[in-house]
Regions:
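Acidic, low-complexity intrinsically disordered segments
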Residues: 1-239
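Catalytic cores of alpha/beta
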Residues: 115-120, 288, 349-364
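A structural motif corresponding to the C-terminal end of an alpha-helix
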Residues: 37-50, 99, 240, 269, ...
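Short acidic/polar active-site loop segments enriched in Thr and Asp
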Residues: 47, 74, 243-245, 298, ...
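Residue-level detector of structured alpha->beta connecting loops
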Residues: 72, 123, 296, 335-337, ...
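Radical SAM enzyme core and accessory elements
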Residues: 2-5, 12, 46-48, 65, ...
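Radical SAM [4Fe-4S] cluster-binding motif and immediate context
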Residues: 174, 178-348, 360
Length: 468
């Protein structure tokens, strides 16, 4: 059979009070989940598999239908995130409008968290939970043979089917094939704060052992690929002249030893790459940052979230302000760039002064860049459950949206102490307080190496400041 994997466009993403520039950044990343899936299926089955990144190309539904029909797809598999349900449903309809299509399958985070709601969407033939490689291959084999695909692990076909457990293909991440990035137009992907050359994302692990209340990742046990497997993938990227790498693990430094081993392998292979990683501040020490810099690390993204120990404790971050300041001071001393992520409108911010305290702390911390967003609790997180228990949040709006996705839906904020409009005004103030400082502008100008850097940084800054 001919399977076309589609990443839907991002024209109607749920408004989550994250600046659109930050949301848009992730839409310019390659669809790693689909690349991994397609590479595995092409290696293990006889079916023909291709990828359509409708997000990268910003395709209208009619254009999606034409592309599906032109490729003569029998089955369309759609990557599904809850915040993109409007575009997911429109992509389902676009697929059904193609004469060649017999089945439409949904998979991805939304199907893991809300399988029954996903299966109930009109036009959907089946839903896959967990890692889709083996379930999707079994589905294709069954449909090709004309068999009813009932009882397949990880697959929900009929609306009366029991909800299957999510499938985990293997805990050995080294057994996964290196994603074939040539299945998409890999030269077109960019990062908001990238280094300017060809860019891609790499995942080296699954899950996170930490317990932040606003995140649903803690439900997944941490497993990491070996340094050798990671560097094999980096070598494959370099072979395509991709040298700007963003490690998008939930937490890159789960242990310092693992980071040291990865860096040692990069250095031993003399890989000429620059890279960014997402890390926690606790455990960061001089030896670690020095090793990371020697291995090509240009920038570290830290989730700081709050400017007080009380705020960090409420979110169960498991870090302290002292650890935050030590990590940023060390990076500054050793010449490694930093990005700090902050939330405003959290349960411990009960008045304007509390929010201003977070904003002022972000300025005083002096990262190279900062990303602010308004706290938006999502169903499935402990913070959302706490909001339900306290009467701050309601599940019904999300349930209605999942049944009937509409573009005017807006995710709930923690509005116990502020209105949405008040929080948006404070968000604007936060960005202006940081990025409109003369010291920040002059510092960025001093770091320019070529004219293209000026254009890239100016574009990023304008999007952060004005695209709201």
């Amino acid at each position: 059979m001919r399977l076309l994997l589609v990443r839907p466009p991002a024209r109607n993403t749920v408004e989550t009070e994250v600046p659109r520039a930050v949301e848009a950044e992730s839409t310019s990343y390659p669809p790693l989940n689909l690349l991994v899936l397609a590479t595995w299926l092409r290696a293990h089955g006889r079916h023909e598999v291709a990828i359509l990144d409708a997000q990268l190309e910003d395709l209208e539904p009619a254009a999606i239908t034409r592309r599906i029909q032109d490729w003569r797809a029998d089955v369309v598999g759609i990557s599904t995130f809850t915040v993109q349900l409007v575009d997911v449903l429109r992509t389902v309809r676009a697929a059904r409008a193609a004469a060649s299509v017999r089945h439409v399958v949904l998979g991805g985070p939304h199907c893991n968290d809300f399988p029954e709601e996903a299966r109930a969407l009109p036009g959907v033939s089946a839903v896959v939970r967990g890692e889709g490689q083996a379930p999707l291959l079994a589905l294709l084999d069954a449909w090709e043979k004309g068999e009813a695909p009932r009882g397949l692990p990880g697959v929900m076909v009929g609306s009366d089917d029991p909800v299957p457990d999510p499938v985990v293909l293997s805990d050995d991440l080294d057994s996964y094939p290196i994603p074939d990035r040539t299945l998409v137009d890999y030269r077109r992907y960019t990062g908001l704060l990238g280094q300017g050359g060809l860019f891609t994302t790499v995942v080296t692990s699954r899950g996170c052992p930490h317990r932040c209340t606003f995140c649903n990742t803690p439900r997944m046990r941490f497993k990491g690929a070996s340094p050798a497997r990671i560097c094999d993938e980096l070598e494959a990227c370099v072979a395509l002249d991709i040298r700007d790498i963003y490690f998008v693990d939930d937490t890159f430094n789960v242990t310092n030893q693992r980071v040291h081993e990865i860096c040692d392998e990069i250095i031993a292979r003399r890989l000429k790459v620059t890279w960014t990683a997402r890390m926690r501040v606790n455990g960061v020490d001089r030896a670690l940052i020095e090793k990371m810099k020697a291995a090509g690390c240009q920038r570290i993204q830290f989730g700081v979230e709050q400017g007080t120990d009380a705020g960090l404790k409420r979110l169960q971050k498991g870090v302290t302000i002292a650890e935050v300041e030590a990590a940023f001071a060390l990076c500054r001393e050793l010449g490694v760039g930093t990005v700090a992520y902050f939330m405003i409108g959290t349960p411990t911010e009960r008045n304007r002064l509390d929010v201003l305290r977070t904003i002022r702390y972000a300025v005083r911390l002096a990262p190279d860049f900062v990303m602010f967003n308004i706290l938006t609790p999502f169903p499935g997180t402990r913070l959302f459950d706490e909001g339900l228990a306290e009467g701050v949040l309601r599940l019904e709006p999300w349930q209605a949206f999942m049944r009937d996705p509409r573009p005017d839906f807006r995710a709930q904020v923690w509005d116990q102490y502020f209105t949405r409009d008040e929080l948006r005004d404070l968000l604007t103030l936060a960005y202006r307080s940081f990025y409109w400082r003369p010291s920040f502008v002059l510092g960025q100008l001093r770091e320019l190496r070529r004219p293209a850097d000026l254009a890239r940084k100016a574009k990023a800054g304008l999007r952060l400041l004005l695209d709201r």
